[in-house]
Amino acid sequence: MLRIGLTGGIGAGKSLLSTTFSQCGGIVVDGDVLAREVVQPGTEGLASLVDAFGRDILLADGALDRQALAAKAFRDDESRGVLNGIVHPLVARRRSEIIAAVSGDAVVVEDIPLLVESGMAPLFPLVVVVHADVELRVRRLVEQRGMAEADARARIAAQASDQQRRAVADVWLDNSGSPEDLVRRARDVWNTRVQPFAHNLAQRQIARAPARLVPADPSWPDQARRIVNRLKIACGHKALRVDHIGSTAVSGFPDFLAKDVIDIQVTVESLDVADELAEPLLAAGYPRLEHITQDTEKTDARSTVGRYDHTDSAALWHKRVHASADPGRPTNVHLRVHGWPNQQFALLFVDWLAANPGAREDYLTVKCDADRRADGELARYVTAKEPWFLDAYQRAWEWADAVHWRP
């Protein structure tokens, strides 16, 4: 099952987007609908709201007077926090009940207005945000919903900012045009990203990663940050640390080329723990690559952890690897044991390249040569670079010793 988090500011067009995804075959779990359901007459949700805000938020028939509640709940941050503290847990519980009844190969679209505000974005393998600028949203709310302009602006101001939404968005859909434009874009996202992602997950297979070098993308750090947050949630306390590694982590150097693949390292206590994370990582969108179980061993292996420093044990180069099923964001997830030489070098390599222009230039030359010789074949590209790493490993540790590097 693929779970998608769908959100957007009030008036941005979230309802149209969720309807389109439903027509494409998604099972939509609407946060607004659930929020109304959990405060129906006779529910614990409505009773809690009355306790918090008073009986004057009720209509004559005992149902919730939403305008009366809004007048109290949106007047300040404290009141809004009380409202969210009552409604959000009840909605989450009802959502979990619905999802538990869904078949394993489905695409569940969770329409959550306050996805960002509630900190739920990392729970989803994919987050889709629909956007429209503030003035357009105000106009829609006034003209289409009959809302007073002051009320519309207050509602918008009470929600997350565009910057906060961009930070969690894997897919950003602009809805400044016609409804037909949004529907077309939404269907394209479904056909080219969502559906292939869901298929890959169901088959426990990864998305094909690009093998060609491309110019540095300034958005790589932000993309990696979303993935790191997602993996921290998926791994929980079993992840000792989660780091952006590899060439895409060497940011701030526009001339430094890399494959458009984000590499992440999850540090664990043991390979047994890494194996325990196979299913949680699959649920997060990262199937395991069973055929990759170790890095290339280096002689006189180094580590800042004394018992692993200056060792020659092949076992200390073992690891587990997962990769993304999402065709829109190729990602490798390396699970390595704390203190083992391969775990240490993955962290050191990024810092060494960032601090040493000569090392970056050397590595770029090697990568470009490997790229030409591999002609788009990823395995050949990786193999072609490996001899350079034997020398680079020693050079990096010489630098680490000189600057007293610590991970």
Swiss-Prot record:
<keyword id="KW-0418">Kinase</keyword>
<dbReference type="GO" id="GO:0005524">
    <property type="term" value="F:ATP binding"/>
</dbReference>
<feature type="region of interest" description="UPF0157">
    <location>
        <begin position="211"/>
        <end position="407"/>
    </location>
</feature>
<keyword id="KW-0808">Transferase</keyword>
<dbReference type="GO" id="GO:0004140">
    <property type="term" value="F:dephospho-CoA kinase activity"/>
</dbReference>
<comment type="pathway">
    <text>Cofactor biosynthesis; coenzyme A biosynthesis; CoA from (R)-pantothenate: step 5/5.</text>
</comment>
<keyword id="KW-0067">ATP-binding</keyword>
<feature type="domain" description="DPCK">
    <location>
        <begin position="3"/>
        <end position="204"/>
    </location>
</feature>
<keyword id="KW-0173">Coenzyme A biosynthesis</keyword>
<dbReference type="GO" id="GO:0002135">
    <property type="term" value="F:CTP binding"/>
</dbReference>
<protein>
    <recommendedName>
        <fullName>Dephospho-CoA kinase</fullName>
        <ecNumber>2.7.1.24</ecNumber>
    </recommendedName>
</protein>
<dbReference type="GO" id="GO:0032564">
    <property type="term" value="F:dATP binding"/>
</dbReference>
<keyword id="KW-0963">Cytoplasm</keyword>
<dbReference type="Pfam" id="PF04229">
    <property type="entry name" value="GrpB"/>
</dbReference>
<dbReference type="InterPro" id="IPR027417">
    <property type="entry name" value="P-loop_NTPase"/>
</dbReference>
<keyword id="KW-0547">Nucleotide-binding</keyword>
<dbReference type="InterPro" id="IPR043519">
    <property type="entry name" value="NT_sf"/>
</dbReference>
<comment type="similarity">
    <text>In the N-terminal section; belongs to the CoaE family.</text>
</comment>
<dbReference type="GO" id="GO:0005829">
    <property type="term" value="C:cytosol"/>
</dbReference>
<comment type="subunit">
    <text>Forms monomers and homotrimers. The monomer is the active form and the trimeric form is inactive. Shift from inactive homotrimer to active monomer is induced in the presence of dephosphocoenzyme A. A dynamic equilibrium between the trimeric and monomeric forms regulates the effective concentration of active enzyme.</text>
</comment>
<feature type="binding site">
    <location>
        <begin position="11"/>
        <end position="16"/>
    </location>
    <ligand>
        <name>ATP</name>
    </ligand>
</feature>
<comment type="similarity">
    <text>In the C-terminal section; belongs to the UPF0157 (GrpB) family.</text>
</comment>
<dbReference type="GO" id="GO:0015937">
    <property type="term" value="P:coenzyme A biosynthetic process"/>
</dbReference>
<comment type="function">
    <text>Catalyzes the phosphorylation of the 3'-hydroxyl group of dephosphocoenzyme A to form coenzyme A. Can also use dATP, with lower efficiency, but cannot use GTP, dGTP or CTP.</text>
</comment>
<dbReference type="Pfam" id="PF01121">
    <property type="entry name" value="CoaE"/>
</dbReference>
<dbReference type="InterPro" id="IPR001977">
    <property type="entry name" value="Depp_CoAkinase"/>
</dbReference>
<dbReference type="InterPro" id="IPR007344">
    <property type="entry name" value="GrpB/CoaE"/>
</dbReference>
